[in-house]
């Protein structure tokens, strides 16, 4: 995977939380750790699922922001490339050797369009989403300037209420413009229903996706009638991939969180009413935290607070234990309820974050652990790449 192996000059506890070969107990906290066995099982499972259903899987890099994790998804899970949300994020992956990059977002600022149009010079195939005909003209001009080619996905707003057009006529108009524009290629449709990914009920998610799939089918039919059949119809996430893959319309999935999982995704249910983190996917990402104070007999204070995680989707839970509970946090402190006084100062706990994506974005490194030993230390390659 071309993972970093030379850590000479790195000081543990200042530059980096751990080094390969260390015991898990020696890792400096708070930091992100990956259970490599669970991660690899998740990646293989999604790859096997996509293959069995005749689908491409393009893993979403906005979740992990790591070139090394993406390469693992490609080598173990057959991922065909990476999805990104920002130009700088796409640059981090392309510069890191990822050869197929889709920006699942609109790029409108002239300077960003210029950078996007230069990106194929790294050797990567680059595709971007569009929801406005004027954007086609700007992208074409920049690609001509740099002598590059860009792929175009027309984005449909199929319920997220964000970017994307809402009518089949608008889809056809933009696709025609892309097909006619120099240095651009119309490749397909982006149709991701983000608003329903975290709905607890399987039936509620299915109802939202049924409506989205019907909308996308109308657009596909309209394109085919104009001789513009899309090569790819792309979308789907960890909370919905089974709907898109059985739709007969989509042929590419964009799942991301399945690889790591988080507390919020764990709360949603499958068709049998089971949590999807109990059999479908495993928790592979944890915030490793240490007890720093136990001055009160029923409360332990740990070193993972707001600056170590995102709590927009709720507080983390303590993994593998029901005798202690993470109950509140401030900038640098987390408070763990310890009714029986079982914790001691310097004990380490694994926390499952409420929301993996923004939690990963506040850390510099992933520490990969197997059988209690540090095996890998990977940089969060696109950390802070929000431009």
From Swiss-Prot:
Induction, as annotated: Induced by glycolate.
Modified residues annotated as N6-(pyridoxal phosphate)lysine in this record: 62
GO terms of molecular function: D-serine ammonia-lyase activity; magnesium ion binding; oxo-acid-lyase activity; pyridoxal phosphate binding
Any Pfam family the entry gives: Ala_racemase_N
Keywords attached to this entry: Lyase, Magnesium, Metal-binding, Pyridoxal phosphate
Top EC group: lyase
Description of the deletion phenotype: Abolishes growth on glycolate or glyoxylate, but the deletion mutant strain is still able to grow on acetate, succinate or glucose with comparable growth rates as for the wild type.
SMART domains: D-ser_dehydrat (SM01119)
Function statement: Catalyzes the condensation of glyoxylate and glycine into (2R,3S)-beta-hydroxyaspartate ((3S)-3-hydroxy-D-aspartate). Is essential for the growth of P.denitrificans in the presence of glycolate and glyoxylate since it functions in glyoxylate assimilation via the beta-hydroxyaspartate cycle (BHAC). Is also able to catalyze the reverse reaction in vitro, i.e. the cleavage of (3S)-3-hydroxy-D-aspartate, and that of D-threonine to a lesser extent.
Protein's name according to its UniProt entry: 3-hydroxy-D-aspartate aldolase
């Amino acid at each position: 995977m071309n993972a970093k192996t030379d850590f000479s000059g790195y000081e543990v506890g200042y530059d980096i939380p751990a080094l390969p070969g260390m015991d898990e107990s020696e890792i400096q906290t708070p930091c992100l750790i990956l259970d490599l066995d669970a991660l690899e099982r998740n990646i293989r499972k999604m790859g096997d699922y996509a293959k069995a259903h005749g689908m491409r899987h393009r893993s979403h890099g906005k979740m992990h922001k790591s070139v090394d994790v993406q390469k693992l998804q490609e080598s173990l899970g057959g991922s065909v490339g990476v999805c990104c949300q920002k130009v700088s994020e796409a640059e981090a992956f392309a510069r890191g050797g990822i050869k197929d990059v889709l920006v699942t977002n609109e790029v409108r600022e002239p300077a960003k369009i210029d950078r996007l149009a230069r990106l194929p010079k790294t050797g990567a195939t680059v595709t971007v989403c569009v929801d406005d005909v004027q954007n086609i003209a700007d992208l074409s001009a920049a690609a001509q300037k740099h002598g590059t080619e860009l792929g175009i996905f027309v984005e449909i707003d199929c319920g997220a209420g964000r970017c994307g057009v809402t009518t089949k006529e608008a889809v056809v108009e933009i696709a025609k413009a892309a097909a006619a524009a120099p240095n651009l290629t119309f490749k397909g449709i982006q149709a991701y229903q983000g608003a329903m990914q975290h709905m607890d009920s399987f039936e509620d998610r299915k109802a939202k996706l049924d409506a989205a799939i019907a909308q996308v089918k109308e657009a596909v039919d309209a394109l085919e009638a104009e001789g513009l059949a899309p090569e790819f119809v792309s979308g789907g996430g960890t909370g919905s991939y089974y709907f898109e893959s059985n739709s007969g319309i989509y042929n590419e999935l964009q799942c991301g969180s399945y690889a790591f999982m988080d507390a919020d995704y764990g709360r949603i249910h499958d068709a049998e009413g089971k949590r999807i983190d109990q059999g479908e996917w495993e928790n592979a990402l944890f915030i490793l935290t240490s007890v720093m104070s136990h001055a009160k007999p029923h409360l332990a204070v740990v070193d993972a607070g707001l600056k170590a995680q995102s709590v927009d989707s709720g507080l983390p839970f303590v993994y593998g234990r029901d005798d202690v509970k993470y109950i509140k946090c401030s900038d640098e402190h987390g408070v763990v309820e310890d009714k029986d006084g079982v914790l001691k100062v310097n004990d380490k706990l694994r926390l499952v974050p409420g929301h993996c994506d923004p939690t990963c974005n506040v850390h510099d490194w992933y520490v990969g652990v197997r059988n209690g030993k540090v095996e890998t230390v990977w940089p969060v390659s696109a950390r802070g790449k929000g431009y």
